[in-house]
């Protein structure tokens, strides 16, 4: 089985390798640089749209069984702004989606992001950790290492696979 991930971020590619490797035998996972079609710092429904676009664009870069797109963004839920990571899995016909746990950023970080800056840049400045998003991620720093970005990404990938793991409960997805 060949899987294309719509990013070259090693954290996201490794998360897909980890989940698909537990679900299937003989899996090849490759990161592909593709566009998301949404702003670099997505808000609301832009986040899931970005994941879907990345999955479809990754799938189309070669001869793959699946394209996987992962996009993190901010979503307002009843006045609480949460960082939520979405995943989409595309097989050429059907797209399934899921998301991981959501969490809040410190007010100072959110204020900077609302002026147009990207969360990753603000968090790297705040922590002094260069390329934080390609390492433990903001979640790793904020949770004091109890959950890192790979684990958070794995959640969203597994959630997007649920309909594929249970085709009789959903519609038939092969």
Curated annotation (Swiss-Prot):
It holds the Pfam family NTPase_I-T. It is an enzyme of class 3 (hydrolase). Transmembrane segments: none annotated. Mg(2+) binds at residue 63. SUPFAM superfamilies: ITPase-like. GO terms for molecular function: ITPase activity; metal ion binding; nucleotide binding; ribonucleoside triphosphate phosphatase activity. Its EC number is 3.6.1.73. The keyword Ribosomal protein does not apply. Keywords: Hydrolase, Magnesium, Manganese, Metal-binding, Nucleotide metabolism, Nucleotide-binding. It catalyses: XTP + H2O = XDP + phosphate + H(+); ITP + H2O = IDP + phosphate + H(+). Disulfide bonds: none annotated. Phosphatase that hydrolyzes non-canonical purine nucleotides such as XTP and ITP to their respective diphosphate derivatives. Probably excludes non-canonical purines from DNA/RNA precursor pool, thus preventing their incorporation into DNA/RNA and avoiding chromosomal lesions. PANTHER family: NON-CANONICAL PURINE NTP PHOSPHATASE_PRRC1 DOMAIN-CONTAINING PROTEIN, PTHR34699. Homodimer. Belongs to the YjjX NTPase family. This is Probable inosine/xanthosine triphosphatase. It comes from Methanocella arvoryzae (strain DSM 22066 / NBRC 105507 / MRE50).
